[in-house]
């Protein structure tokens, strides 16, 4: 399997045919060689951590996940989506594919960012 990263970055998990890296996606994408990835699966922030509460099993619980899920205004969130999608396109091989999960809170921005980038 060809080397994907510039420099020595240890894979979190790997076999002869695939590797999984654990870390900040923006930092890892910067270190990846252009057109080096066949498939990307992205589960970006949904921007739901807003100090709200929900009911789970009859108990009121916080919706906050962590700071990585806190959103700004629409422009900030959309700029973030454009940035990581642009970086994904750089490392994706011609003919490669990207799968992105989302909710109604972020998927429309992601769709628009895919068209813009």
Annotate each predicted stretch with a short phrase.
Residues 1-117:
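S-adenosyl-L-methionine-dependent nucleic acid methyltransferase catalytic domains
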